[in-house]
Amino acid sequence: MRKLFTSESVTEGHPDKICDQISDAVLDAILERDPNGRVACETSVTTGMVLVTGEITTNCYVDIPKIVRNTIEAIGYTRAKYGFDSDTCAVLTSISEQSPDIAMGVDESLESKQGGMDKEDVIGAGDQGMMFGYANNETSEYMPMAISIAHKLSRRLSEVRKNGTLPYLRPDGKTQVTVEYEDNKAIRIDTIVVSTQHGPEVTREQIEKDIFEHVISKVVPVEFLDENTNYYINPTGRFVVGGPQGDAGLTGRKIIVDTYGGYGRHGGGAFSGKDPTKVDRSAAYAARWVAKNLVAAGVADKLEVQLAYAIGIAKPVSISVETFGTGKIDDRKIVEIINKVFDLRPSAIIKELNLRRPIYKQTAAYGHFGRTDVELPWESLNKLEEIKNLI
């Protein structure tokens, strides 16, 4: 049976991604000075303005307006004619401390209050919720092909803009990839969509030629392209007005781009701007770590892990797996392996993955999972032998 599946990505200059990067830049700046800082930082951008809000509890000072301007400059919004630039945009801040009602459950979990002696029981989950992790073996990074290629296209768009290969490009852009499957195996790419902001002086024909030559052909495996592959490059014909001038942006509004492109389920919680006591982030990273190690160990060809937590409780209230008919062993056995190999209490996740450090801004564009350009601890295949010994 044949079917099509599509995923999208966006560049670092997309309005929502600007917000994610600002929120994570603030988080990184605080963790660099205060590894135990509590951060929930939200950002909104619109024409000529940035608003940073949230709850931050820390013993250090960070210059948020300076962080905002430096982040916008690094993305590439440096000229007024782009409709948004780092020097002239207004930066507003409204920051308060973390609610003491939340802090009391995070600082000391219910297990600890009831006399638990295990040091990893001390920190309770920062909220309730469910988080999903996914991995499959259709790419070398154990990611679905559509989102993997879409991210690489978006990253390449920024590369050719910043290195001067295509100097007329501007920071905003989006990509989309449709993969055709036969009997659940990726066999070809059916459609590629690239929309990129550009200067008014360049023709659509030139953009199409350059994007195909310098972006698509440099990224997409040629063996997955054929004469029937569809290419849509700036299909509206013009994309001069973009970034926050074209659309307002918010932190946490690209959660499917951030994860598996819709191929795996999502619990609904965003990542950027959140310190690792927030299980929306740390447990989603842990779930990916679990799923990737299990697939790499040969437990299944596709595997999705769900973790669920209650606020103030250290241990997950549930762990479940789905192998989509590809499992080599029973799902109940897989859950047993997870419980034996992985400690999924927030304190243990933070310790094992070394999450109290400034590593987050680099995740805020081009995906949090399956990255080949940066090293991320939840992508480590460091549990393979333990898993194989239990299969």
UniProtKB/Swiss-Prot annotation:
GO cellular component, one term: cytoplasm
Residues binding K(+), per UniProt: E42
Catalysed reactions, semicolon-separated: L-methionine + ATP + H2O = S-adenosyl-L-methionine + phosphate + diphosphate
A Pfam family assignment: S-AdoMet_synt_M
Highest taxon in the source lineage: Bacteria
Amino-acid positions noted as binding ATP in the UniProt annotation, renumbered to this chain: H14, D172, G173, K174, R238, F239, D247, R253, K254, A270, K274
Region (Flexible loop): 98-108
Positions contributing to L-methionine binding: E55, Q98, D247, K278
Protein source organism: Clostridium tetani (strain Massachusetts / E88)
SUPFAM superfamilies the UniProt entry points to: S-adenosylmethionine synthetase
GO molecular function: ATP binding; magnesium ion binding; methionine adenosyltransferase activity
Protein name: S-adenosylmethionine synthase
Stored CDD domains: S-AdoMet_synt
GO BP, one annotated term: S-adenosylmethionine biosynthetic process
Gene3D superfamilies linked to this entry: 3.30.300.10
Pathway linked to the protein: Amino-acid biosynthesis; S-adenosyl-L-methionine biosynthesis; S-adenosyl-L-methionine from L-methionine: step 1/1
Binding positions (Mg(2+)): D16
